[in-house]
Structures are given as structure tokens and as C-alpha cells.
């Protein structure tokens, strides 16, 4: 019996795959539990159109991510002022939210905090640090962060 998988199954395949399985397995397990549907002509056409649409969306997301990286590549380094204690250690830390906010201000594009990845955890010391800006899992760029002491006069 021919079926279309609605979700990824370890022993069978990925979502959207068209497979032949034993009819009892399909009727008694896959279809009643919502893991597959019968592979009729209409369902096959629908799945093919759905896959094409998902591929177009993926290409669009990747192109948007690449344009974001190009805009950020023009920024040499980002200076973030922070309150500093003894021996250059920060009060608190500079997190992904702070870096995303500063990058958004400098590049005029919206950057979400989950697009920032740290190489060694949150930044807790004054100095030069590197973080990864990753708007899509296949597109990333390394960004220089310079944390400086905030003036106490303000």
C-alpha cells in the first residue's frame, strides 16, 4: 500500500515521503495515529505543491539571512559600554539581547536575540570578544564585540 508520511519516522522516512508499506501496518497504525495518509492522486499533488512551496520559502529565508549578514559585515566592531567592577569584571553580563539591540541600532535591521550565539558563554569581562550572528542555520558571520567601561559621571 502506498502512503504519504505526515511526520518523520525513524524506521521509515521523512515528512512528505511517498512509501510502500504493508497494508496492515498502514491501516492499523500509521493512518489511525495520524502519521500517514493514503497516497491518492490528489494527496500526492497536494504534497508535491506543499514541498515546492516550502522550498520557495526556504530560499526566501536564506536570501533574507544573507542580506542581513551583508549589512552586518560592513560594521567593523561593536562597542558596548557596561558597568565594570574590580579587575575588569562586569556587574552582570552582556547577553544576546544587548548585542542584538546594538546591532539593530547600527545596521537598521531587526535582529532577534536568538540569532546571536556565544563562543564561550555570556560576556562577563571588559575587552574584545567574538560572537556569531546566525540568522539561518546555513548562514552565519562572526562579529567583533568590544566591551568598555561605562563612565561613572553620568
Swiss-Prot record:
Domain of life: Bacteria
Xref: InterPro entries: Ribosomal_bL9 (IPR000244), Ribosomal_bL9/RNase_H1_N (IPR009027), Ribosomal_bL9_bac/chp (IPR020594), Ribosomal_bL9_C (IPR020069), Ribosomal_bL9_C_sf (IPR036791), Ribosomal_bL9_N (IPR020070), Ribosomal_bL9_N_sf (IPR036935)
Entries under SUPFAM superfamilies matching the protein: L9 N-domain-like (SSF55658), Ribosomal protein L9 C-domain (SSF55653)
Disulfide linkage: none
Any GO CC annotation of this UniProt entry: ribonucleoprotein complex
Biological process according to GO: translation
GO MF assignments: rRNA binding; structural constituent of ribosome
Keywords linked to the UniProt accession: Ribonucleoprotein, Ribosomal protein, RNA-binding, rRNA-binding
Ranges in coiled-coil conformation: none
Summary of the function given for this chain in its UniProt record: Binds to the 23S rRNA.
Similarity comment: Belongs to the bacterial ribosomal protein bL9 family.
Protein name: Large ribosomal subunit protein bL9
Amino acid at each position: 500500500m502506498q502512503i504519504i508520511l505526515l511526520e518523520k519516522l525513524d524506521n521509515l522516512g521523512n515528512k512528505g515521503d511517498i512509501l510502500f508499506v504493508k497494508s496492515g501496518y498502514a491501516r492499523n497504525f500509521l493512518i489511525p495515529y495520524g502519521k500517514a495518509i493514503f497516497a491518492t492522486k490528489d494527496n500526492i499533488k497536494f504534497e508535491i505543491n506543499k514541498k515546492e512551496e516550502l522550498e520557495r520559502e526556504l530560499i526566501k529565508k536564506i536570501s533574507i539571512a544573507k542580506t542581513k549578514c551583508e549589512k552586518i559585515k560592513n560594521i567593523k566592531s561593536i562597542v558596548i559600554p557596561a558597568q565594570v567592577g574590580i579587575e575588569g569584571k562586569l556587574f552582570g553580563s552582556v547577553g544576546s539581547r544587548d548585542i542584538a539591540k546594538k546591532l539593530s541600532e547600527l545596521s537598521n535591521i531587526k535582529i532577534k536575540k536568538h540569532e546571536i550565539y556565544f563562543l564561550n558563554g555570556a560576556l562577563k569581562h571588559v575587552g574584545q570578544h567574538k560572537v556569531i550572528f546566525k540568522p539561518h542555520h546555513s548562514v552565519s558571520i562572526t562579529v567583533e564585540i568590544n566591551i568598555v567601561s561605562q563612565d561613572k559621571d553620568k
